C-alpha cells in the first residue's frame, strides 16, 4: 500500500512540473545571438534556428568558418543572418558583440552562450597565465555578454542559454583551470537565476550540461602528462571494459558526445506570466551519440529546451 501511495505521489509530482508544450512557431522571427557558432554544437544550433525562421547573429573566433555557417543558414531559410568574428579572450570583445547584435536585430530574445577555449593538459594548464586566459574566455566573457544583453532580454522577456560541461559538476584530472571555469558558470548563473526571480525579472535561464567527447587530441594530451598505462584496471575490471558499458563502437574518425544523467530537482512554478523553470525528463542512463551527422536529433531535442524556460541540472 505504501509503495502504491508513494508511486502515485511521485506521478502527481512530475505531472505537475512536466509540461512539454513546445511550439516551433515560437522561434519564428526570434532574435538570437549565438556564440561559438563556427563548429560542433554551435553550428548545429545555428542550423536549427535557421530552419525555424529565427533572425541570427553568429559569432566565433574563425571568420572563414563563420562565413560557411552563415551561407548554410541562409540556404535553410533564416530571414536574417549576420556574423561578427570576435576573440573572447579580449576583454573588449563581449560588449562589442552584443552591441553589434542589438544594432542589427533591434533587440534580443535569446542569448545562447556556447563558446569555449581549451588549454594544454598537465602542469602547463595550471600556470597562472593559462588559468587567467581560460577564465576570461570560459567564464568572464560569459558574464560580460550576459550583463550587456540582460536589459534587452528583460524587455523581451527572453531566454538566456548557457552551454556548460560535465567538468563543471565533476572534477577531472588534467582539466584544472577549465573545470574551475565551468564550476564558476554553474555558481554564477544559478545565483543569477535566483536574483532575477526575487526581482520578478522574467528572463529564463537554461543550463545545458554536456558530457565528454572522445577525441584523439584529448587522449594524446593526457598521455603526454602521465606515465600511467592508457587502460589501468580498477577493481579488477579493465578501463576499456568499464567504458564499453557506456560508449559503443564509434564511427571511424567521429567525435562522440555523451550526455550526463545529472539533471537535479525541478524548481517551483512561478507566479509570473510564464513559467521560468522546468526540468527535462531523465531516463537514468547515459546515451552516447556518435558523429555529428547522427547527432542532429539530439541537438534538436536540445534546441527544444532552448526555446522553453528549462533549467538543466541542479542548483
Curated annotation (Swiss-Prot):
SUPFAM superfamilies: NAD(P)-binding Rossmann-fold domains. The active site is at residue 178. GO terms for molecular function: oxidoreductase activity. It catalyses: cortisone + NADPH + H(+) = cortisol + NADP(+). InterPro entries: 11-beta-HSD, NAD(P)-bd_dom_sf, Sc_DH/Rdtase_CS, SDR_fam. Its main location: secreted. Highly expressed in the brain. Its EC number is 1.1.1.-. Belongs to the short-chain dehydrogenases/reductases (SDR) family. This is Hydroxysteroid 11-beta-dehydrogenase 1-like protein. It comes from Homo sapiens. The lineage of its organism: Eukaryota, Metazoa, Chordata, Craniata, Vertebrata.
Amino acid at each position: 500500500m505504501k509503495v502504491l501511495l508513494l508511486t502515485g505521489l511521485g506521478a502527481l509530482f512530475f505531472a505537475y512540473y512536466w509540461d512539454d508544450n513546445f511550439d516551433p512557431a515560437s522561434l519564428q522571427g526570434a532574435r538570437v545571438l549565438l556564440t561559438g557558432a563556427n563548429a560542433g554544437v554551435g553550428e548545429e544550433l545555428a542550423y536549427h534556428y535557421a530552419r525555424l525562421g529565427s533572425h541570427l547573429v553568429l559569432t566565433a573566433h574563425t571568420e572563414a568558418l563563420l562565413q560557411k555557417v552563415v551561407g548554410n543558414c541562409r540556404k535553410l531559410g533564416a530571414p536574417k543572418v549576420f556574423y561578427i568574428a570576435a576573440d573572447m579572450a579580449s576583454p573588449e570583445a563581449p560588449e562589442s558583440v552584443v552591441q553589434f547584435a542589438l544594432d542589427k536585430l533591434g533587440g534580443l530574445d535569446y542569448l545562447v552562450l556556447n563558446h569555449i577555449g581549451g588549454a594544454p593538459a598537465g602542469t602547463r594548464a595550471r600556470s597562472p597565465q593559462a588559468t587567467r586566459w581560460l577564465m576570461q574566455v570560459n567564464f568572464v566573457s560569459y558574464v560580460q555578454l550576459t550583463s550587456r544583453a540582460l536589459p534587452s532580454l528583460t524587455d523581451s522577456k527572453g531566454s538566456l542559454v548557457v552551454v556548460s560541461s560535465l567538468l563543471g559538476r565533476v572534477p577531472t584530472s588534467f582539466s584544472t583551470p577549465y573545470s574551475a571555469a565551468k564550476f564558476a558558470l554553474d555558481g554564477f548563473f544559478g545565483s543569477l537565476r535566483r536574483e532575477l526571480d526575487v526581482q520578478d525579472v522574467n528572463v529564463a535561464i537554461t543550463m545545458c550540461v554536456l558530457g565528454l567527447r572522445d577525441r584523439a587530441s584529448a587522449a594524446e594530451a593526457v598521455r603526454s602528462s602521465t606515465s600511467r598505462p592508457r587502460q589501468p584496471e580498477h577493481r579488477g575490471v579493465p578501463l576499456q571494459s568499464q567504458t564499453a558499458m557506456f560508449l559503443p563502437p564509434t564511427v571511424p574518425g567521429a567525435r562522440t558526445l555523451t550526455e550526463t544523467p545529472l539533471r537535479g530537482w525541478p524548481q517551483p512554478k512561478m507566479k509570473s506570466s510564464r513559467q521560468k523553470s522546468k526540468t527535462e525528463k531523465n531516463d537514468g542512463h547515459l546515451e552516447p551519440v556518435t558523429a555529428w551527422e547522427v547527432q542532429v536529433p539530439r541537438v534538436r531535442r536540445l534546441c527544444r529546451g532552448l526555446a522553453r524556460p528549462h533549467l538543466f541540472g541542479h542548483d
